[in-house]
Amino acid sequence: MTVVLQAFPDFMPPRFKTDQGSVVSTAAGRRTIQLPIDTGVLCLRGLSPERHRFELEYALERGSTANSVLFEAADGAAAVLVHPPGAAYSSVFLPQLNTLLGDAEQPLLVVVGHVNPNRIALLRSLAEIYPKLELIASNPGA
């Protein structure tokens, strides 16, 4: 799935606790930025300046990204996280997600297209933090 994102400078999701365009960095150089898509919809883009396979395979510029989309929970409904990153981004992704969601006891739906060993580590961490997590996978055997 390809998503074209445009940042809206005056947009602030009503219930997300976020700083517009906030960035979290680590010693490894990975960071996560927040890009609002629409009311209640936020892209969490994990960035890495290091050389990765995408640069070689797809002739992209140096570095790679891991894009996730978070849909705000409506009253009485679960928040929806689509395509969380792999374990390499967990140290920058999980703190931002925790800040945005606030209450770890709220239901959380996680949607993935496939599950691989890299993603399983982050999914395990999510399940430990959010006991009401429900995983939806369209191709769990891939």
Task: Label the model's feature ranges.
Residues 31-99:
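Conserved beta-strand hairpin/beta-sheet module of binuclear metal-dependent hydrolase folds
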Residues 25-27, 35-39, 130-142:
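Metallo-beta-lactamase
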Residues 87-136:
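Active-site metal-binding motif and surrounding structural segment of the metallo-beta-lactamase
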Residues 16-19:
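Short, Gly/Pro- and small/polar-rich lid/capping loops
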Residues 22-25, 60-61:
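Short linear motifs in intrinsically disordered
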Residues 49, 118, 141:
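Surface-exposed, flexible loop/turn segments at secondary-structure boundaries
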Residues 3-11:
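Non-catalytic regulatory/accessory regions that flank a structured catalytic core
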